[in-house]
C-alpha cells in the first residue's frame, strides 16, 4: 500500500481497504487480532492474498488470530483449531480435519 500513501481511502479498492484495516490493527502491536469477515466479498485471488498476509503475520509476530469467517477454504487452510457455531450453539471444537468430518457441521452448513 506504500504507493497509495498520499491517496484518500475513498479511492482504495476493496482489497486495498482490507489490507489497510489489517495494517491499522497491527500498528499498535496487539497480542490478539480478531479478523471479522475480513474476506467477505473478495475474489478467490484476493482471499488468497489476505490469507498470505494473515499467515505471515502469525508466523512473524506469533500473534493469536481469531478468524470469524464464512469462507471455509480460508478457515480450513489457516486455522489450527476451528470452532463452529449453529444458531449460537457450539457444534464443533476441533482441528480442521476433525471438523470437516463432523456430521453436525455437515448438517449445519450443507443441510440434510
Regions from the PLM with identified roles:
Residues 1-112:
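Glycine-rich phosphate-binding loops of nucleotide-dependent enzymes
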Amino acid at each position: 500500500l506504500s504507493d497509495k500513501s498520499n491517496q484518500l481511502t475513498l479511492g482504495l479498492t476493496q482489497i486495498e481497504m482490507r489490507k489497510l484495516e489489517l495494517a491499522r490493527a497491527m500498528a499498535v502491536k496487539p497480542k490478539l487480532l480478531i479478523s471479522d469477515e475480513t474476506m467477505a466479498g473478495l475474489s478467490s485471488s484476493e482471499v488468497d492474498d489476505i490469507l498470505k498476509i494473515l499467515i505471515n503475520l502469525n508466523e512473524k509476530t506469533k500473534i493469536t488470530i481469531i478468524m470469524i469467517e464464512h469462507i471455509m477454504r480460508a478457515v480450513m487452510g489457516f486455522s489450527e483449531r476451528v470452532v463452529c457455531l449453529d444458531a449460537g450453539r457450539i457444534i464443533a471444537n476441533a482441528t480442521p480435519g476433525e471438523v470437516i468430518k463432523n456430521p453436525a457441521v455437515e448438517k449445519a452448513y450443507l443441510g440434510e
